[in-house]
């Protein structure tokens, strides 16, 4: 049982759309024993909502602008999530910073994907920053969510070469291909019980993963 939270127009938004479109009677990609119970966005015009609705998945909008504090917003978000009793919360471009109370509540059962090779380029505008820094490699990272922004324990990373003529848009498109590959893999591992967070360390099949997680080879 998973819940997807898309927000805003970001590259991760396409992931939420891909998840919703690939569901057949609630089963992701036909190979993961899981169902999406609810898709939540904080923006009413989020494309992921329409895609989820088309796939027959329940949706809900919780507008953060209607709340007087981050704590109040997170409390309502928690109520909506817990009503479905999910095993896993999947963030897909949800561009809000959570309170420590929220991240603690879902410790070990909330995943996020970030368009950089963490710990490099946390936050926004990662592709522009990668080009400006003249790095040789860029990519995407799947990690468990913690109270530190884009700083939770690493699960899986995929890299791409940064080419001399790359624009941020071109580089983002190449990274997005890798995002589409590695996020479903990480979700599948979690749903199969192979991927766990224990004492703030990531275990895969009972074995401790390196600090940078598994390096994906396509």
Residues covered by each model-derived region:
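Short, basic/aromatic-enriched C-terminal tail that caps enzymatic domains
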Residues: 199-218
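N-terminal Rossmann-like dinucleotide-binding module
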Residues: 1-47, 51
């Amino acid at each position: 049982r998973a819940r997807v939270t898309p927000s805003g127009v970001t590259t991760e938004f396409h992931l939420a759309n891909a998840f919703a479109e690939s569901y057949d009677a609630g089963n992701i990609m036909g190979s993961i024993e899981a169902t999406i119970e609810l898709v939540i966005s904080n923006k009413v015009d989020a494309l992921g909502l329409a895609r989820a609705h088309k796939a027959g998945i329940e949706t809900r909008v919780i507008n953060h602008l209607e709340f007087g504090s981050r704590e109040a917003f997170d409390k309502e978000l928690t109520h909506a999530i817990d009503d479905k009793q999910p095993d896993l919360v999947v963030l897909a471009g949800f561009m809000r910073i959570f309170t420590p109370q929220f991240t603690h509540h879902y410790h070990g059962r909330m995943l996020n994907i970030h368009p950089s090779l963490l710990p490099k380029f946390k936050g926004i505008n990662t592709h522009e920053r990668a080009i400006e820094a003249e790095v040789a490699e860029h990519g995407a990272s799947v990690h468990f969510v913690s109270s530190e922004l884009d700083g939770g324990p690493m699960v899986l990373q995929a890299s791409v070469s940064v080419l001399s003529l790359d624009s941020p848009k071109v580089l983002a498109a190449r990274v997005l291909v890798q995002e589409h590959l590695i996020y479903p893999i990480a979700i599948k591992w979690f749903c199969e019980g192979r991927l766990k967070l224990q004492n703030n360390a990531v275990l895969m099949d009972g074995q401790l993963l390196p600090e940078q997680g598994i390096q994906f080879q396509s």
